[in-house]
Amino acid sequence: MAEATYTPRLRTHYDSVVRPKLIEEFGYKNPMQVPVIEKIVINMGVGEATADTKKVTTAAADLARIAGQKPVLTRARKAISNFKLRENQPVGAKVTLRQARMYEFMDRLITVALPRVRDFRGLNPKSFDGRGNYAMGMKEHIVFPEINYDQVEQIWGMDIIVCTTAKTDDEARALLRAFNFPFRQ
């Protein structure tokens, strides 16, 4: 039985444009040395979950719509009485995207979601961690086209972490620039 092979647009772009560009720029001898995006982790912390646990499930449903994959509920590791937080209480949701879903999400993030962010001046070029990973935060999850603005009960923020195999921040920055990430000048 022959399976239909589907390759995301950005994966094809990586193979045809990004990889040769990075080999030329950094002078890699082996094509396996070229950095690649390993995974994208989306984390949504719901602070109001201490009062109402239903909000976590609503946030998780929105995150599932955005990512196209069921999220894992994150739970409190220890109890903190000042925050009215008990151990093992759900406090958020997270999703790890790899392969095709990762490229599809990245495509929607770059082409649709980031241009819809209010007062967007570009991504912070200093948000690299020193090991080739990039982290960014979004204040509103309603910028994604999968979320219907009229049916949203509450607006939540999210953290998006792009993990790469790059050894340095410069390599990771060149990789993400080649994918047209809109960095601030």
Swiss-Prot record:
Key word tRNA-binding present: yes
Q: Name one GO molecular function term.
A: structural constituent of ribosome
Signal peptide range equals: none
Its domain of life reads Bacteria
Keywords for this entry? Ribonucleoprotein, Ribosomal protein, RNA-binding, rRNA-binding, tRNA-binding
- Any S-S bridges, and between which cysteines? none
Q: Please provide one cellular component term from the Gene Ontology annotations of this protein.
A: ribonucleoprotein complex
Q: Which family, according to the similarity comment?
A: Belongs to the universal ribosomal protein uL5 family.
Q: What does this protein do?
A: This is one of the proteins that bind and probably mediate the attachment of the 5S RNA into the large ribosomal subunit, where it forms part of the central protuberance. In the 70S ribosome it contacts protein S13 of the 30S subunit (bridge B1b), connecting the 2 subunits; this bridge is implicated in subunit movement. Contacts the P site tRNA; the 5S rRNA and some of its associated proteins might help stabilize positioning of ribosome-bound tRNAs.
* Listed name of the protein: Large ribosomal subunit protein uL5
